[in-house]
Amino acid sequence: MQIQCPDYILKAIDILKYNGHSAYAVGGCVRDSVMGRTPNDWDMTTSATPDEMKLAFDGYRIIPTGIKHGTLTVMIDSHPVEITTMRIDGSYSDSRHPESVSFTKKIEEDLSRRDFTVNAMAYSPETGLVDPFGGRLDTERKIIRCVGNPDKRFHEDALRILRAIRFASVLGFGIEEETAASIIKNRCLLNDISKERIRAELIKLLCGQNVEKVLLEFKQVIFEIIPELQATDGFLQHTPYHIYDVWTHIAKVTSSIESTSDLRVAALLHDIEKPSMFRLDEKGVGHFKGHPQKGAQTAEEILRRLRFSNAEIKHIATIIYLHDERPDGNRHHLAKLCAKFGIDNVDDTMKLIIADAHGKNPSIIEQEIQVAENARKQISEMRAENACLSIHALDINGNDIMALGIDRTQIKDTLDYLLDSVIDEKAENKKAALEKAAVNYINKK
């Protein structure tokens, strides 16, 4: 099999070969090439030690990115190329890093330490594809399979548990039976992994094309990371709007929404407090009053634990808080919602409402989708018009208010009143009109 490597990779291979070393493209770039995809990044492995690499690339900019494990980054024709010495890993004690590594000249030994067969392939123009573990066949069959014993692989680095289901989600692959069983068996090892690493893999997993299938098949892994979701599994909703239990509904909504990290995370957590807020009325119909508000609070706690940024937490929690809002077509009501919570947050809430509908009874969701889509059209019109949706967009400011003789303690209330007046079309967003409205407001208080 021939793979089209970029010129800068071929150049790196030629330089190492000229200096007496073997060199290969390796890992995900080879997998993607076998799949017919264009790789985002190209990594290499070589028989050269780090010191030998430095000699071979004399005159090139070299960054010692992982010198302890034999990794250098070499700038070749303005491209950063990560090159790692072929190695054999020693024992693992922290479920993440080998305690020691020993270098090897054999590509097969280096490939044997890798996580999955689809990532355990190497390529050079001289040798062609090097595939000692059947990675090409697994790639063609769309199967994620551990190299060697799955239990051993996951005990070496527990993050591989999440990586496996992330690859299944992103690539649309299935997971081989023995590997899948080991994932479930060893999921508790994820508790030894840093929250930052968990967060990064979880986001990639959630943004994958096959996320619904993965969330349903490997729900135990998700519950290990976010135990607060466990109660949603199998929880029946007892309402004609819902034909799925809460967890299945969550999986469908997550798959339906736009594939951005904040929206996918919001979808995952949006109904997390439905079980705790469930009430059955005298007719046997289920209700979940208050679950968005409580869910937003729980989401904040989870996201803080998983080391999301403050901006991400605020955005996601706001969307969850608002997701039971049902716009009635009244532009003034929608504009006030945008003024209070931010136009981007309200627009993203409408996206969640539309996805939410796709996780409900298909026979009765069309009206709900149409209402939210109409709201998004109105939001788009507001953007185009540069509609006044915050006090900062008013043609008057706090200094102007004080110049009218109004006490500084009344500034915020006055500006809020003026914004409402502009949104309700009771006042024009012009300074003179706003000054008059401000004076009238204070005089009536």
Which positions does each model-derived feature cover?
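Catalytic cores of the polymerase beta-like nucleotidyltransferase superfamily
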Residues: 1-445
